[in-house]
Amino acid sequence: MASQGTKRSYEQMETDGERQNATEIRASVGKMIDGIGRFYIQMCTELKLSDYEGRLIQNSLTIERMVLSAFDERRNRYLEEHPSAGKDPKKTGGPIYKRVDGRWMRELVLYDKEEIRRIWRQANNGDDATAGLTHMMIWHSNLNDTTYQRTRALVRTGMDPRMCSLMQGSTLPRRSGAAGAAVKGIGTMVMELIRMIKRGINDRNFWRGENGRKTRSAYERMCNILKGKFQTAAQRAMMDQVRESRNPGNAEIEDLIFSARSALILRGSVAHKSCLPACVYGPAVSSGYNFEKEGYSLVGIDPFKLLQNSQVYSLIRPNENPAHKSQLVWMACHSAAFEDLRLLSFIRGTKVSPRGKLSTRGVQIASNENMDNMESSTLELRSRYWAIRTRSGGNTNQQRASAGQISVQPTFSVQRNLPFEKSTVMAAFTGNTEGRTSDMRAEIIRMMEGAKPEEVSFRGRGVFELSDEKATNPIVPSFDMSNEGSYFFGDNAEEYDN
């Protein structure tokens, strides 16, 4: 990638750091994890949770959401100014599950946001520790990516539901900063920009006045983030066009959708980080492990090792399959919703199935669901091998992919060829090559036509044994190419509703 040198590594984004060396980065990421762990331990004490209840992923999600809501300044301000009945803007809470007389009970807890902020800061040596908050947001985002297929959102902005492999991070809040921007897929950025342009078309004052100036600079910033994700000159030039447009409108929306489609073959670079639930970090910290001292990385072996030694439980609805629930969470932990399933099966050591074949709904339990028949079971989050997370889209080739999802966005830096349905993708590029961007469009289409099926991505990269911490012996996996490679094949994944 041309601009590799100018970019900060993710760990630097993750920790708002200046240029740091590897050891400093590992220490500052470790410090962030320590803070989340200490906070989680304290919350379990406040809520009087048993060890088992503290390792329940549903309780972890509630506690994470409480602290994220306590620090959501814009929303807090909005709630104070627009009071709604029955909602106290100063309080936050959610369902906490406890085991009472041999059955699971739901208890709704409510805390002062001020109190939650105090506990969080205390766990983080008095800092606001924004990096830790962003880390939890990314974990929630990865879980959403694995659980839901954003069909409706794609269709609403004029994109194709089969482009779901570009939608990583589509549910991340706007306030997730540089670390959040790094993990957003091409489709997510395009969707945010299209929404913005549509508002400008409908609202004459959107780009005008004092506010309009801020809006404009946000628009240009988002264009630049998207440009930085593209790896070819023509795609980048197209983003310059969109950014410099005097009055963004339908022509820009067309160009954006074109560039998103092109990313199915000419993939963008999207960061991947293994962000684990707080209930994994808490017990590790309370067992005396010092993440800051030992150092930690979100993109290497560390999350795999941590999951090998963690016990996490989940509530299971009456007709759900615990093994399927485990797969869902395992994929979320490794930010692997859009990775090739054959590679995931190899790394995990058990077959990873497409979303539509899983008998499991989301991890969160709705407040109106009946608790009477709820069981709980251990989530199997261990792996057979580990692999390095990638930040590049790999290079492109073609191979049969599925009806539901026609491309992948690689998570792991491992040698393979990347599947995409070339005929399907190319069919979308008929006709329209006139207008200002015609030469770029022609160039992009030419590159896509040239993508060869036999090309291999991440050449020489492999997976590693869990005992191989220094990554000295890469094992290059061999795949059964007749197998299905896409997770959102067909598609019976539920919709994500805000």
Swiss-Prot record:
InterPro entries: Flu_NP. Pfam families: Flu_NP. The keyword Amino-acid biosynthesis does not apply. GO terms for cellular component: helical viral capsid; host cell; host cell nucleus; ribonucleoprotein complex; viral nucleocapsid. Keywords: Capsid protein, Helical capsid protein, Host nucleus, Host-virus interaction, Ribonucleoprotein, RNA-binding, Viral nucleoprotein, Viral penetration into host nucleus, Virion, Virus entry into host cell. It is found in: Virion; Host nucleus. Residues 1-21 are annotated as: Disordered. A motif (Unconventional nuclear localization signal) lies at residues 1-18. Its main location: virion. Homomultimerizes to form the nucleocapsid. May bind host exportin-1/XPO1. Binds to viral genomic RNA. Protein-RNA contacts are mediated by a combination of electrostatic interactions between positively charged residues and the phosphate backbone and planar interactions between aromatic side chains and bases. Belongs to the influenza viruses nucleoprotein family. Encapsidates the negative strand viral RNA, protecting it from nucleases. The encapsidated genomic RNA is termed the ribonucleoprotein (RNP) and serves as template for transcription and replication. The RNP needs to be localized in the host nucleus to start an infectious cycle, but is too large to diffuse through the nuclear pore complex. NP comprises at least 2 nuclear localization signals that are responsible for the active RNP import into the nucleus through cellular importin alpha/beta pathway. This is Nucleoprotein.
